[in-house]
Amino acid sequence: MAANDTIADMLTRIRNANLARHQTTQVPATKMTRSIAKVLREEGFIAEIEEAEEGVKHNLVISLKYKGKNRQPLITALKRVSKPGLRVYSNRKELPRVLGGIGIAIISTSSGIMTDREARRQNLGGEVLCYVW
């Protein structure tokens, strides 16, 4: 099934897999989902990313991380901010801080997809894609 909002689809699949305590989840591979998964891996929210091909379909297999004996998910929440019907942009001075810096905001800038911290360091603004904490 084709999704109109691949980012929301990706976040929902990760959220559902976390709630069900799955080790991995599959997400349709696009440039945007690859970039977001790469940021999540660099920030330590997910373990690893692999590419899987099933005929014509290309998927990303995302390995999730858990902590402790009870396998508590490292990702507490994922929230989509900018949506196809209502885009949310932020200039470099007004980039959001998620939970006072505990979480991250994933920003789409002219230099690619990055966290709010990286965007601040590079003095860039852009579209606020989602919050992760």
Swiss-Prot record:
Biological process terms from the Gene Ontology for this record are: translation
Spell out the InterPro entries in the cross-references: Ribosomal_uS8, Ribosomal_uS8_CS, Ribosomal_uS8_sf
Q: What Pfam families does the record point to?
A: Ribosomal_S8
Q: Which UniProt keywords apply?
A: Ribonucleoprotein, Ribosomal protein, RNA-binding, rRNA-binding
The UniProt GO MF terms for this protein read:
rRNA binding; structural constituent of ribosome
- SUPFAM superfamilies reported in the protein's UniProt record: Ribosomal protein S8 (SSF56047)
Question: Could you tell me which Gene3D superfamilies the record lists for this protein?
Answer: 3.30.1370.30, 3.30.1490.10
Cysteine pairs forming cystine bridges in this chain are none
Q: What does this protein do?
A: One of the primary rRNA binding proteins, it binds directly to 16S rRNA central domain where it helps coordinate assembly of the platform of the 30S subunit.
How is the quaternary structure described?
A: Part of the 30S ribosomal subunit. Contacts proteins S5 and S12.
Q: What is this protein called?
A: Small ribosomal subunit protein uS8
The gene behind this protein is: rpsH
